[in-house]
Amino acid sequence: MGFVYYVTLFVFIDDWVGLQSSAGKLNALLFSLLASLCLFSLSICVLVDPGRVPASYAPDVEDSGWSNSNVTETRKCDKCFAYKPLRTHHCRVCRRCVLKMDHHCLWINNCVGYANYKAFFILVFYATVASIYSTVLLVCCAFKNGDSYAGNVPLKTFIVSCGIFMIGLSITLGTLLCWHIYLITHNMTTIEHYDSKRASWLARKSGQSYRHQFDVGFYKNLTSVLGPNMIKWLCPTFTRNPEDGISFSASRDS
């Protein structure tokens, strides 16, 4: 991230319009804002606990199936030897159960789960926007200074290498962003997506249609992660919602 920030400001913007110009200052300010939002989102992903099962948690036996508004399931972790709520999984790296676990992310050295999934998604969003923005600035810089770069082999090699890197980074982050948009709009975690493949195959085999049990509709799926206030959707701080990480609204209740 530090390398991308440095070359964007002191190479791409400076060589294109100059950092002291009005356009240069504006672009530097906008990119610095994006970089700050990335760092803020990253810090939340790293520092916030993804979701710990309460020590006092015990499933309600009478509510072990479908209820009026929520679904729960009695399950016990064979590693923690404790009850774990629905959508909770045991992380082999963290060596504990995580509420609504999506995956363990090596880049943040933390699990992505109920309490920090929004921050992770917003981090990917801002990082994608920043990488595309940097790539556009690189292209503008290259078009303006193409002739001068052509006569300087080391500089030309550096610019081309940066272009390959930034395009690859933008495609990678953009793909990751699209993937998590898909998961959010279907109210799935990464783990549940792969689990649902078999369920979907079995449903088709028996001539039935399959719908993920927590898919409660496009808008409700979005608000379950991003929160009910649209103004705060791009703020990475965790937004409390009616779900508590232990019980969740189910599709047959929607």
Curated annotation (Swiss-Prot):
The DHHC domain is required for palmitoyltransferase activity. The chain crosses the membrane at residues 1-21, 28-48, 119-139, 164-184. GO terms for molecular function: protein-cysteine S-palmitoyltransferase activity. Belongs to the DHHC palmitoyltransferase family. Keywords: Acyltransferase, Cytoplasmic vesicle, Endoplasmic reticulum, Lipoprotein, Membrane, Palmitate, Transferase, Transmembrane, Transmembrane helix. This is Probable protein S-acyltransferase 15. Its main location: endoplasmic reticulum. PANTHER family: PALMITOYLTRANSFERASE ZDHHC16. It is found in: Endoplasmic reticulum membrane; Cytoplasmic vesicle membrane. The lineage of its organism: Eukaryota, Viridiplantae, Streptophyta, Embryophyta, Tracheophyta. It is an enzyme of class 2 (transferase). InterPro entries: Palmitoyltrfase_DHHC, PFA4/ZDH16/20/ERF2-like. Disulfide bonds: none annotated. It comes from the Eukaryota. Residues 75-125 form the DHHC domain. It is a multi-pass membrane protein. Its EC number is 2.3.1.225. One of its GO terms (cellular component) is endoplasmic reticulum. GO terms for biological process: protein targeting to membrane. Palmitoyl acyltransferase. It catalyses: L-cysteinyl-[protein] + hexadecanoyl-CoA = S-hexadecanoyl-L-cysteinyl-[protein] + CoA. The active site is at C105.
